[in-house]
Structure formats: structure tokens, C-alpha cells
From Swiss-Prot:
Family listed: Belongs to the NAD kinase family.
Species the sequence originates in: Polaromonas sp. (strain JS666 / ATCC BAA-500)
Name of the featured protein: NAD kinase
SUPFAM superfamilies reported for this sequence: NAD kinase/diacylglycerol kinase-like (SSF111331)
Primary role: Involved in the regulation of the intracellular balance of NAD and NADP, and is a key enzyme in the biosynthesis of NADP. Catalyzes specifically the phosphorylation on 2'-hydroxyl of the adenosine moiety of NAD to yield NADP.
Active site positions, chain numbering: 73 (proton acceptor)
């Protein structure tokens, strides 16, 4: 039985060692499954894979019905932000480190992908975040994020003071090294390192996690993603904001960063029988050494 996905885009972590040969092998495998393969244009130009058609993100959105990402979670997040508006499902083959969302082991990709291409998979939809920076009433920066929005102090010593509001209601002023607003997907990333909780992907919420707060009672809090969170820069030098891998290097006093749920979702496809808890056990090394 041939693939249910006729047109497949291949996106790679092209800086990784051996990426060209890995991508070429996967492309040829997809061809044997009845798929027409196109290579994302940056991947093609950086690996020299010119024997296949090349497409930019808009072209993938218009012509492909599946995107196969070979790399780590960062590679997946980068292309996923561009493709979310088109509703293209994403499958991840891990060539990074942890691989929470690029969950197919490279050495197993053929055996794992064959049934998935026939339609045997678990679909996992996750809401994105839409953020903007408002200065003197004018938007000076906007971005979408899948993992988190982070406001933090600059390279100089000293904390930042941040005023936090939810739906226009004052929550608190926080003096800290920064503040993380993380989605359930991002709760396994920087937010986890800063002491935040894990949020199951099905939870329609976010977690606010202070980074090294001066007041020890400033603890992480879980909020609904149906509202809008605003963080205002009250004090501190050289503060910056990061939206996944996108940055605004300099924030000024009075700048307001607002975060709300995006209208777009990322669609991840996992092997049949996939479990979020299996992923946590494996990636976070739970129960290792337990008989």
C-alpha cells in the first residue's frame, strides 16, 4: 500500500554533520513509498541537494501535504512557525539532542515511517503564541512562538522589574532576572530549567515562571491561554525579549510585551501508540536504574 501523502517536503538541520547523506537517503526512501519529494530551499542551498525540486515555506504550504523535519526541536520549531498558517502536518526525525517533538529515532525511520505514511499515526495539535512589543502605543516588534516568550535582563549586572497583568488586571511587580511565559510544549524547555511545572499538551494553558526572583514567594503560576498576558518593563538596563529563537535585543522602560494565543496550531504526527508520558520517561530519564 502506497503513501497517503503524495507530496512531501523535506527540511533538514543542514549544519549538522552528515546531514546531506541523511536527507538524501530519506528522500530516496520516500520515493520508494510513492511520494513526490521537494526540498526546502534553505536546506537545498546549504546541502547541495539540487536533484530534487526546491520550495520555500509558501510553496510547501501550497503544494505539499506533509513536511518531514530532520533535526532537533529547534529545526522543527523554526519551520513549524512558518508552516502553521497552512495547516501542514509535521513529522520529526531526531538528529538533535533531546527531541521532545522530533521523536522518531533516525536509525528507525524506515520502519517507523512506513505505517505512518499509510495513515497509521497519532495526531497532536498544539496552539502557538502570538506576541508583540508595544512602545509609546505603537507595535515595534511582533512574532509567533511555539515554546515560550522570555523577558530577561541584559548582560549588565542587576535585575529587571516587570509589571505583570492578565486581561488588564494587575498581578504583581516582579524583580528578577526575567520571566518566562511558556506553552505546554515549552514547559519542557527553559521553563523546566527555571523550576516550572510540566504541562500536558492537551491543557489550554500557559505557565509564568520567574527567573531567579528576588522575592522567593514569587512562584510559577499556570494560567488559561484564553486571556492576554502583558509584561511591562518598569526598571532595569538592557532588558531583552526572546520569542523562541527570535529576539528583540533592547527593551526600553515602559515597553509592553503582550502575549495571546495565536489563531494557528502546529500539527504533529507521531507513530501509532505514541504517548506523551513515554516521551517524558525517555527524555527525562525517569525510572532509570529502577528494577
Amino acid at each position: 500500500m502506497k503513501s497517503q501523502f503524495r507530496h512531501v517536503a523535506l527540511i533538514g538541520k543542514y549544519h549538522a554533520q552528515g546531514s546531506r547523506s541523511a536527507l538524501e537517503d530519506i528522500a530516496h526512501f520516500l520515493g520508494t513509498q510513492g511520494c513526490d519529494v521537494a526540498i526546502e530551499q534553505d536546506t537545498a542551498s546549504n546541502t547541495g541537494l539540487t536533484q530534487f525540486p526546491t520550495l520555500d515555506a509558501a510553496g510547501i504550504g501550497a503544494q505539499c501535504d506533509l513536511a518531514l523535519v530532520v533535526g532537533g526541536d529547534g529545526t522543527m520549531l523554526g519551520i513549524g512557525r512558518l508552516l502553521a498558517q497552512f495547516g501542514i502536518p509535521l513529522v520529526g526525525i531526531n538528529q538533535g539532542r533531546l527531541g521532545f517533538i522530533t521523536d522518531i529515532a533516525f536509525e528507525d525511520y524506515q520502519d517507523t515511517l512506513k505505517p505512518m505514511l499509510r495513515g497509521e499515526f497519532e495526531e497532536d495539535r498544539r496552539w502557538m503564541m502570538q506576541a508583540k512589543v508595544v512602545r509609546d502605543g505603537r507595535c515595534v516588534f511582533s512574532a509567533t512562538a511555539m515554546n515560550d516568550v522570555v523577558v530577561n535582563r541584559g548582560a549588565t549586572a542587576g535585575m529587571v522589574e516587570l509589571r505583570v497583568e492578565v486581561d488588564g488586571r494587575f498581578v504583581a511587580n516582579q524583580r528578577a532576572d526575567g520571566l518566562i511565559i511558556a506553552s505546554p510544549t515549552g514547559s519542557t524547555a527553559y521553563a523546566l530549567s527555571a523550576g516550572g511545572p510540566l504541562l500536558h499538551p492537551s491543557i489550554p494553558g500557559w505557565v509564568l515562571v520567574p527567573i531567579a526572583p528576588h522575592t522567593l514567594s514569587n512562584r510559577p503560576i499556570v494560567l488559561s491561554d484564553a486571556g492576554e498576558i502583558t509584561v511591562e518593563i518598569v526598571a532595569g538596563r538592557d532588558a531583552s525579549a526572546n520569542f523562541d529563537m527570535q529576539s528583540l535585543a533592547t527593551l526600553l522602560h515602559g515597553d509592553r510585551i503582550t502575549v495571546r494565543r495565536s489563531e494557528h496550531q502546529m500539527r504533529f504526527l507521531h507513530p501509532k501508540g505514541w504517548s506523551y508520558f513515554d516521551t517524558l520517561r525517555k527524555k527525562l530519564h525517569w525510572n532509570e536504574g529502577v528494577a
